[in-house]
Amino acid sequence: MFMINLFSLIIPILLAVAFLTLVERKTLGYMQLRKGPNVVGPYGLLQPFADAIKLFTKEPLRPLTSSKFMFTIAPALALTLALTMWVPLPMPYPLINMNLSMLFILAMSSLAVYSILWSGWASNSKYALIGALRAVAQTISYEVSLAIILLPTMLMNGSFTLSTLTTTQEHLWLIFPLWPLAMMWFVSTLAETNRAPFDLTEGESELVSGFNVEYAAGPFALFFMTEYANIIMMNALTAILFLGTFHNPLLPEAHTINLILKTSLLTICFLWVRASYPRFRYDQLMHLLWKNFLPLTLALCMWHMSIPIMLACIPPQT
């Protein structure tokens, strides 16, 4: 039974990832005054399946001097961790209801750094290694701001459980009292998922393709799916944290539809940002976090922690 639950979680995620690639290409196409994919199937709807067949039927080549075990295991580990992060998300009920689901998601996203580092190092290519080091530095740096932003949010929630956020936001979405943190959270999720304008790991003009430069066929497709699964997961998390999802115990489907709509809108914002802004310079990226976001988030964190003490009130105890 558990395996059925697991597959019923994984298969829709992979389908969503497939169609997100199509939505991205269509969005970028229309923003650049062209059509995007429109040959395979009606309006190009079968393009993701054509891409999948092409990638998974090609021969996966491996550089002669690469580390065979790490080179092979890195993409599989990346996708496994990306899918594991979905387990505690309430939609409206999580697959496994954890007391510390938010910490679990942070821990899993930290572990994802290893797959990037292994893939870059095992490729035995200078471009892949530089791309991997950049990706690791960027991911670790922005996780600091994500964790600090989560503290006041969880303080208002009263626990680290994601399921209780629905109850907390019944009357007021947390985006209103926490709007500066919500804005910084959105930018940090862009950086965390290595998306434009923070996609320095795959600077085509300098690093060819970043840490996955030596990958082809199936393993490359796994990295590609990981990136898009992480994007959808981060946006679903943003919707749960700040855009309280409507929940009626008699109609649990309404919660799921609500969450899907909000996640889709946030994902389209990700694509919109990609189409609109140029890439940051590496030092600007680091300065944004360590000199702007970190002092701001720390100050706001102390402010939000002092409010309950000052007003002698307690967060919701659920």
Curated annotation (Swiss-Prot):
Its EC number is 7.1.1.2. It is found in: Mitochondrion inner membrane. Its main location: mitochondrion. InterPro entries: NADH_UbQ_OxRdtase_su1/FPO, NADH_UbQ_OxRdtase_su1_CS. One of its GO terms (biological process) is mitochondrial electron transport, NADH to ubiquinone. It catalyses: a ubiquinone + NADH + 5 H(+)(in) = a ubiquinol + NAD(+) + 4 H(+)(out). GO terms for molecular function: NADH dehydrogenase (ubiquinone) activity. GO terms for cellular component: mitochondrial inner membrane. The chain crosses the membrane at residues 2-22, 69-89, 102-122, 146-166, 171-191, 231-251, 253-273, 294-314. It is a multi-pass membrane protein. It is an enzyme of class 7 (translocase). Keywords: Electron transport, Membrane, Mitochondrion, Mitochondrion inner membrane, NAD, Respiratory chain, Translocase, Transmembrane, Transmembrane helix, Transport, Ubiquinone. Belongs to the complex I subunit 1 family. Core subunit of respiratory chain NADH dehydrogenase (Complex I) which is composed of 45 different subunits. Core subunit of the mitochondrial membrane respiratory chain NADH dehydrogenase (Complex I) which catalyzes electron transfer from NADH through the respiratory chain, using ubiquinone as an electron acceptor. Essential for the catalytic activity and assembly of complex I. This is NADH-ubiquinone oxidoreductase chain 1.
